């Protein structure tokens, strides 16, 4: 069988660097025991991975999603909070979760003009000089 080259796969995956990442990921999957979708023909795992991409037996988008999923260390899951859960408000006092909705409406923010900010910055004392800098 002819060698699989990047040109055989580049029309399936536009970026050759992404192609290398996807083929490497698929080769690792094959070495871990994943089912191959093309005949082995005494080829090594990276060549099989490239042949699978070239023959479109695997979707590059599916490989990309699988690669991203395999590299994630923490998957954030949105879980609803239980009603009546006790949490702390800004003052540190324990408040039931149902009461915090009303407390959020009463929050006020101080507004500062640019002139007030600059005047406050000018009043700051610069740090002592040291040899660390």
Curated annotation (Swiss-Prot):
It comes from the Bacteria. Gene3D superfamilies: 3.90.940.10. GO terms for molecular function: DNA binding; DNA-directed RNA polymerase activity. GO terms for biological process: DNA-templated transcription. It holds the Pfam family RNA_pol_Rpb6. Keywords: DNA-directed RNA polymerase, Nucleotidyltransferase, Transcription, Transferase. Its EC number is 2.7.7.6. InterPro entries: DNA-dir_RNA_pol_omega, Pol_omega/Rpo6/RPB6, RPB6/omega-like_sf. GO terms for cellular component: DNA-directed RNA polymerase complex. SMART domains: RNA_pol_Rpb6. It catalyses: RNA(n) + a ribonucleoside 5'-triphosphate = RNA(n+1) + diphosphate. HAMAP family: RNApol_bact_RpoZ. Belongs to the RNA polymerase subunit omega family. The RNAP catalytic core consists of 2 alpha, 1 beta, 1 beta' and 1 omega subunit. When a sigma factor is associated with the core the holoenzyme is formed, which can initiate transcription. Promotes RNA polymerase assembly. Latches the N- and C-terminal regions of the beta' subunit thereby facilitating its interaction with the beta and alpha subunits. This is DNA-directed RNA polymerase subunit omega. The lineage of its organism: Bacteria, Pseudomonadati, Pseudomonadota, Alphaproteobacteria, Hyphomicrobiales.
């Amino acid at each position: 069988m002819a060698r699989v080259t990047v040109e055989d796969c580049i029309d399936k995956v536009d970026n050759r660097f992404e192609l290398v990442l996807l083929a490497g990921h698929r080769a690792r999957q094959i070495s871990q025991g994943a089912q191959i979708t093309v005949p082995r023909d005494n080829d090594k795992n990276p060549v099989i991975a490239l042949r699978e991409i070239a023959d479109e037996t695997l979707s590059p988008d599916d490989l990309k999603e699988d690669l991203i999923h395999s590299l994630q260390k923490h998957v954030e899951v949105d879980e609803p909070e239980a009603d009546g859960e006790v949490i702390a408000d800004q003052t540190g006092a324990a408040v039931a979760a149902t009461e915090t909705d009303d407390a959020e409406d009463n929050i006020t923010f101080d507004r500062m003009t640019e002139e007030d900010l600059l005047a406050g910055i000018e009043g700051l004392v610069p740090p002592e000089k040291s040899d660390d800098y």
